[in-house]
């Protein structure tokens, strides 16, 4: 068995001319295709590329080669790549077909012809386009309010994809450019949520992925509602707070913590709490304190359960009159789940 050895690239022109001289005649060349400069052919990755070469001189000898060596010499295939074959729709065609094109196929290809008069060449430059693909993106992140956040989104593709960041809210801002990094300085609670990274080029539809940003912040009382109560009836005080993580609630009266007992019932869900008196008596009238706390802080609001006709306002207000030791004790208790 004879083993074929690819010649050195520097010797390819000489080898090719010698090879062409040995080839049998038969394939002509259309000289008009060989008088112009290099043609560019653009093909999407995975598609089939056809590099055209048409001849007209019946006494010519033809070969295809690229930077790696000789691909075809006449009808003799030198390349070991099964994706490569000749395309002959008619007797004068000597085109090269490359199936399932990949990025390593990109480069210059030469159709070289030895005519009766002089050698001629036609060059084709194959450009391989690649759809955008996000290769790396930040994981979901949780930070405290006021921190600096950097999100990363890296993508591959040809041409180079353009990266666009967008905050997925009704009024979310779009951050556009070729930067892979999105920096948020001093992040606020309003900037929490999902961020979308979009990588786009002209080859196909964009590749899109998301990152969730959670912003922790201390509790803020958003609503505290006092209530009018008639003796012998049921009455409730309600308190709502905004916080991440969700706050824990406690109720106090006269610096004494209240538990669900003796006709009092406390119900707390995420972000809100209520204190219900099942059967109001004279001793239940007065000031109550709702305390909301999470690992970042504690706040409180003062509410009033008042008699019918009292001149006291209906809406409670945030109060700083509660002793600091009580707030500190409440926070420690909530954090330790006492």
UniProtKB/Swiss-Prot annotation:
Domain of life according to the entry: Eukaryota
Propeptide span(s): 316-338
Subcellular location: Cell membrane
Signal sequence residues: 1-28
Pfam families according to UniProt: I-set, Ig_3
Glycosylated sites: 40, 66, 136, 148, 279, 287, 300, 315
CDD domains, per the entry: Ig
Disulfide bonds: 53-111, 153-197, 239-290
Residues recorded with modification Phosphotyrosine: 94
Lipidation (GPI-anchor amidated asparagine): 315
Predominant place of localization: membrane
Stretches assigned to the Ig-like C2-type domain: 29-122, 132-214, 219-304
Alphabetical keyword list: Cell adhesion, Cell membrane, Disulfide bond, Glycoprotein, GPI-anchor, Immunoglobulin domain, Lipoprotein, Membrane, Phosphoprotein, Repeat, Signal
Record's keyword annotation contains Glycoprotein: yes
Record membrane topology: Lipid-anchor; GPI-anchor
Tissue: Expressed on limbic neurons and fiber tracts as well as in single layers of the superior colliculus, spinal cord and cerebellum.
Protein name (database record): Limbic system-associated membrane protein
Organism, scientific name: Homo sapiens (Human)
Gene name of the record: LSAMP
């Amino acid at each position: 068995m004879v083993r074929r050895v690819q010649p050195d690239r520097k010797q390819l022109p000489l080898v090719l001319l010698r090879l062409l001289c040995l080839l049998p005649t038969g394939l002509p060349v259309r000289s008009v295709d060989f008088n112009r400069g290099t043609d560019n052919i653009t093909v999407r990755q995975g598609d089939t590329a056809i590099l055209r070469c048409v001849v007209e001189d019946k006494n010519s000898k033809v070969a295809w080669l690229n930077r790696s060596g000789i691909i075809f010499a006449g009808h003799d295939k030198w390349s070991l790549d099964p994706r490569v074959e000749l395309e002959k729709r008619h007797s004068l065609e000597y085109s090269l077909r490359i199936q399932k094109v990949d990025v390593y196929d990109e480069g210059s290809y030469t159709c070289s012809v030895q005519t009766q008069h002089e050698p001629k060449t036609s060059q084709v430059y194959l450009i391989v386009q690649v759809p955008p693909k996000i290769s790396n993106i930040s994981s979901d992140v949780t930070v405290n309010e006021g921190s600096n956040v950097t999100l990363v989104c890296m993508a591959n593709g040809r041409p180079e994809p353009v990266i666009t960041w967008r905050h997925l809210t009704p009024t979310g801002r779009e951050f556009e450019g070729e930067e892979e990094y999105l920096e948020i300085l001093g992040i606020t609670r309003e900037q929490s949520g999902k961020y979308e990274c979009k990588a786009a080029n002209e080859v196909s539809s964009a590749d899109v992925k998301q990152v969730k940003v959670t912003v922790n912040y201390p509790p803020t009382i958003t609503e505290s509602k006092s209530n009018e109560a008639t003796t012998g009836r049921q009455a409730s005080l309600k308190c709502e707070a905004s916080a991440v993580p969700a706050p824990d609630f406690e109720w106090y009266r006269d610096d004494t913590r209240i538990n669900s007992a003796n006709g009092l019932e406390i119900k707390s869900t995420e972000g809100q709490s209520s204190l219900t008196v099942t059967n109001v008596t004279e001793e239940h009238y007065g000031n109550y304190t709702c305390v909301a706390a999470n690992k970042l802080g504690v706040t409180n609001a003062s509410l009033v359960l008042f008699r019918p006709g009292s001149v006291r306002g209906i809406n409670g207000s945030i109060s700083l009159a509660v002793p600091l030791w009580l707030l500190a004790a409440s926070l420690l208790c909530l954090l330790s789940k006492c």
